[in-house]
UniProtKB/Swiss-Prot annotation:
Catalytic reaction equation(s): tRNA(n+1) + phosphate = tRNA(n) + a ribonucleoside 5'-diphosphate
GO biological process: rRNA catabolic process; rRNA processing; tRNA processing
Protein name, as recorded: Ribonuclease PH
Described function: Phosphorolytic 3'-5' exoribonuclease that plays an important role in tRNA 3'-end maturation. Removes nucleotide residues following the 3'-CCA terminus of tRNAs; can also add nucleotides to the ends of RNA molecules by using nucleoside diphosphates as substrates, but this may not be physiologically important. Probably plays a role in initiation of 16S rRNA degradation (leading to ribosome degradation) during starvation.
Alphabetical list of SUPFAM superfamilies matching this protein: Ribonuclease PH domain 2-like, Ribosomal protein S5 domain 2-like
Annotated family: Belongs to the RNase PH family.
Binding annotation for phosphate: 86, 124-126
Gene giving rise to this polypeptide: rph
EC number: 2.7.7.56
Domain of life where this protein originates: Bacteria
EC main group: transferase
């Protein structure tokens, strides 16, 4: 039994609140256990200069934590005057993952801005951001469809992400909280589509190694969790699902 009473391959409690904010075209508050992230999607009727004239759209992301998302207050990056390497890595990861399932030609020359703001962190903030951002993005696309600016919702598949790891005395576990993540021998983030295709796998041994058999076990656990997350995304999206499938 894990520190929070879960089974080894059991997700934390997940809740996706749709249309959480008033102004964005799409928004959600995603709760993954005690990790909470507000994800919003904004549609801009233009593309970056390097995309002009190509007839395709673009998806990009920004990620941030409020100062007391963590146990000890962290200084806002805006106060420091620069974005940290960790934040830049996560922003690129979110944008890259979402672009993998967006039909950029069907989107047209528009930019989707994804903003992920962590209001409480207890492990898995980047994976929660990706899972929530996908729903926010689809909600924004539904607005485009209703306005007859696109002929279909421009996504090719579902997308979700979770963490897996190897924790001493537990073995392979799914969806690590901060207490588990901080002592894990192996930590891995996995992003997959609804068709079971991998978008990205980030795995690291923390002063430890892992075998091919353990890698397979980690990926099996992640796949199980991601398919459950996609079912929750579908439930949150409701009737919009009929425009995707």
């Amino acid at each position: 039994m894990r520190v929070d009473g879960r089974e080894k391959t059991e997700l934390r409690h997940i809740h996706i609140h749709t249309n959480y904010l008033k102004h964005p075209e799409g928004s959600v508050l995603i709760e993954v256990g005690d990790t909470k992230v507000i994800c919003s999607a904004t549609i801009e009727e233009r593309v970056p200069p390097f995309m002009r004239g190509e007839g395709k759209g673009w998806v990009t992301a920004e990620y941030a934590m409020i100062p007391r998302a963590t146990e000890q207050r962290t200084i806002r990056e805006s106060s420091k005057g620069k974005v940290t390497g960790r934040t830049m890595e996560i922003q690129r990861l979110i944008g890259r993952a979402l672009r993998a399932v967006v039909d950029l030609e069907a989107l047209g020359e528009r930019t989707v801005w994804i903003d992920c703001d962590v209001i409480q962190a207890d492990g898995g903030t980047r994976t929660a951001s990706i899972t929530g951002a996908y729903v926010a993005m689809v909600l924004a696309f539904e607005k485009l469809l209703q306005a007859e600016k696109v002929s279909k919702i421009p996504v090719k598949d579902y997308l979700a992400a979770t963490s897996v790891g190897i924790v001493e005395e537990q073995g392979v576990v799914l969806d690590l909280n901060y207490a588990e993540d901080s002592k894990a021998d192996v930590d891995m983030n996995v992003i997959m589509t609804g068709k079971g295709q991998f978008v990205e796998v980030q795995g690291t041994g923390e002063e430890a190694t892992f075998s091919r058999a353990q890698l397979n076990e980690l990926l099996d656990a992640a796949e199980k969790g991601i398919f459950q997350l996609i079912d929750m995304q579908k439930e949150a999206l409701g009737d919009i699902v009929s425009h995707i499938e």
